[in-house]
Structure formats: C-alpha cells, structure tokens
C-alpha cells in the first residue's frame, strides 16, 4: 500500500517539490549563517566545520524522530551508511567548499545544476538501475541547456577550467549523483531513513574533524544563530529523508 502511494505521480511531484524548496532555502540560510557565525566567504576550513555541525545535528534529528527509537545499524548496514556518508556528505561538501573559493558563481551553478542529469546517466550506465532511452537523453540535453541559459544572465562565460575550482565542483556534483544511485541500491536491503540518519552523523563527524584540523572556527552571539543552525539541520534531515524514500520506490529519472 505504501509503495503504491509513493509511486503516485501527484505524490512524487509534491514530495520532490518540498525537497527542492527546502534545498533552495538552504542557500540563503548558509549565507546568513556565515554572517551570524562570523565565517569569511573564502574560509573553507570554517565552512567545513559549520557544515559538519549542521549535518551531525541533522543525523541526530533523523534518528530520534524518524526511526521510532530503533536506530541501531546491523553489521551489513554499516558499510552502506559509510558509503553514503562518503559520497553524499564528505566528498560532496569537501570538494564543493574547496572549489567554490576558486570558481565563479556562474560556472559553479551550471556544473551543480547538472546533478539531476548525471543521476540519470550514472543510474543507467554504471548501476544499471534503468534504461537510458532516447527521450531521457533528449530531456537531459534540453534540461542542461536550460540550466546554462538561466545561469548566464547576460554574464560572459569563458572556457577556463581550474583543477582546484570548476573541477572540484564537478567532483562534488558527480559524488552527489552517485549518492542517489547508492540510495536506490541500498534501500532495497535497508531502511533508507535509518541509513540517512547515520550517514549524516558519520559524514558530519568527518567534516567537523577536517574543519578543526584545518584551523576552522566560528563564534556567535545570542541564541538566534543556534535556531538558524537547527533550522538548517531540519532542512537536511527532512529533504534528504524524503528524497531517500522517493528513490526507494521510484526510478531515479522520475
């Protein structure tokens, strides 16, 4: 019954829109958070520390509120959670923050916008979770062209490609796309909500350690920054959990 309900077009569309709205609200919150926590735009180490705290808290929320108290991983599920932590949190955000300091906003948005299309390609050609048909290829081309046009906005786009800038953003995007395919694969064997919570905690812990070792730090005054951090954790917890459930019952291209 739950599977049929989660496969209804209106349900898929509605939940996917919620995910997109939550992820969209994260970007302005991140900028506000940097101001509240006194983090410079080029301070990648402090940004990693900040992201680690956010994701660790998100993992705690998912496990406490989304697993009905049964948050223990089986031995066979530990490698799954670790794999998701590597691709969905660690690689994605380490390379994103590192690359963002050396890439233009336009190029970063274009490369990051290719995520949805990379998910289809990776799920089809590498994980063989669905067939890559002509309409899907055409849809990817048209969709990516739309992303490019929207992000150009009259600004010039040079063809330069820096290994520590655009290339890092590309690695981040590919990593995020791979994580969607892994979620689809693992959700047939384990509870995606449980995996989501643990991967957030594992990935968040690694980001916190990396940020601290690189000299990251932040400071804040008052209680407002803590409420913002809690909201950002809720964004990740709700959006990624819903996305995991959608991928469990639907093909990635849908």
What are these language model-derived features?
Residues 76, 109-112, 128-149, 159-165, ...:
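Loop-to-transmembrane alpha-helix entry segments
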Residues 30, 35-90, 118-122, 175-179, ...:
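Transmembrane alpha-helices of multi-pass small-molecule transport proteins
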Residues 49-52, 56-60, 88, 92-93, ...:
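Specific alpha-helical transmembrane segments that line the substrate/conduction pathway
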Residues 14, 18, 52-57, 79, ...:
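Hydrophobic residues within alpha-helical transmembrane segments
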Residues 32, 64-67, 94, 98, ...:
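Membrane-interface helix caps of multi-pass small-molecule transporters
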Residues 62, 121-122, 134-154, 207:
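Hydrophobic transmembrane alpha-helices of multi-pass small-molecule transport proteins
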Residues 1-49, 158-185, 205, 209, ...:
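Glycine-/small-residue-enriched transmembrane alpha-helix faces in small-molecule transporters
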Residues 26, 63, 67-112, 149, ...:
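Specific transmembrane alpha-helical segments of multi-pass solute transporters/efflux pumps
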């Amino acid at each position: 019954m739950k599977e049929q309900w989660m496969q209804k077009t209106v349900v898929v569309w509605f939940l996917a829109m919620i995910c997109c709205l939550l992820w969209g609200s994260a970007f302005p919150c991140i900028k506000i958070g940097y101001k509240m926590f006194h983090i410079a735009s080029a301070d990648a180490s402090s940004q990693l520390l900040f992201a680690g705290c956010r994701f660790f808290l998100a993992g705690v929320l998912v496990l406490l509120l989304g697993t009905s108290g049964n948050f223990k991983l089986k031995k066979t599920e530990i490698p799954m959670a670790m794999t998701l932590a590597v691709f969905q949190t660690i690689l994605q955000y380490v390379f994103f923050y590192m690359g963002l300091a050396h890439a233009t906003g336009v190029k970063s948005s274009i490369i990051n916008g290719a995520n949805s299309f990379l998910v289809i390609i990776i799920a089809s050609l590498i994980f063989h979770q669905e067939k890559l048909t002509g309409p899907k290829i055409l849809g990817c081309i048209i969709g990516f062209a739309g992303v490019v046009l929207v992000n150009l906005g009259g600004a010039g786009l040079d063809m330069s490609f820096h290994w520590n800038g655009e290339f890092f953003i590309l690695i981040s995007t590919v990593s995020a796309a791979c994580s969607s395919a892994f979620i689809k694969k693992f959700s047939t064997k384990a509870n995606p909500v449980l995996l989501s919570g643990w991967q957030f905690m594992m990935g968040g812990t690694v980001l916190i350690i990396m940020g601290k070792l690189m000299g990251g730090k932040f400071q804040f005054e008052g209680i407002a920054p803590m409420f913002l951090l809690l909201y950002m954790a809720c964004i990740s917890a709700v959006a990624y959990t819903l996305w995991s459930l959608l991928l469990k019952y639907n093909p990635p291209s849908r």
